[in-house]
């Protein structure tokens, strides 16, 4: 099966965060690590649900974005988007497991549908269960911190203000070394 190879080599985005070869795997592992932390520190969290959702939350990106060197949106990506594609994949995977609990399937699908947190950020649903909120927070934190890392790496030795950044709605600079 080509899926594991594609997953390892795929980017997590065309641009913005983790838009490099292997970015999808790096992002997925970072999000999963954060979710593991949440599950350890908040006993109400259903650990298996959250970790499964973390591992598969961006699976739809394999169909949404073409492989390198193109790394551009596919027709499925333009028409459907990775959230819908990922939710559909999760439903199909659960259907292959005999007696998979329907409520658990819906909760997994909900986590994928809600992982961007807000409808204006592309989520068709906002988080309604603790695991969906934890996944959203981990996904958002990793995406933003990686984006800042990329911005500051591009700035090189520039320790001054870098100018207004639309994504962060702020003028940015690196932390001083003092």
Model-predicted segments: where are they?
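Long, charge-dense, solvent-exposed interaction surfaces that engage phosphate-rich ligands
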Residues: 6
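Loop-centered beta-sheet repeat module
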Residues: 9-39
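Divalent metal-dependent catalytic cores for phosphoryl transfer on phosphate-bearing substrates
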Residues: 16, 37-155
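N-terminal intrinsically disordered, cationic/polar leader segments
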Residues: 136, 154, 158-166, 170, ...
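Glycine-rich, flexible loop/turn motifs
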Residues: 12, 16, 75, 164, ...
């Amino acid at each position: 099966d080509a899926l594991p190879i594609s997953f390892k080599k795929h980017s997590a985005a065309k641009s913005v965060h983790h838009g490099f070869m292997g970015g999808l795997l790096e992002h997925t592992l970072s999000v999963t690590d954060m979710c593991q932390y949440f599950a350890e520190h908040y006993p109400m969290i259903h650990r298996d649900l959250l970790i499964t959702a973390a591992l598969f939350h961006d699976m739809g990106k394999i169909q949404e974005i073409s492989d390198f060197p193109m790394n551009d949106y596919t027709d499925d990506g333009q028409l459907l988007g990775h959230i819908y594609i990922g939710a559909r994949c999760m439903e199909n995977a659960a259907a292959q497991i005999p007696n998979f609990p329907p409520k658990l399937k819906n909760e997994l699908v909900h986590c994928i549908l809600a992982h961007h947190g807000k409808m204006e950020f592309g989520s068709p649903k906002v988080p309604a269960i603790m695991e969906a909120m934890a996944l959203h927070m981990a996904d958002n934190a990793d995406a933003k911190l990686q984006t800042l890392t990329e911005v500051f790496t591009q700035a090189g030795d520039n320790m001054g203000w870098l100018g207004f950044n639309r994504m962060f709605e702020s003028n940015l600079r690196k932390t001083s070394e003092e």
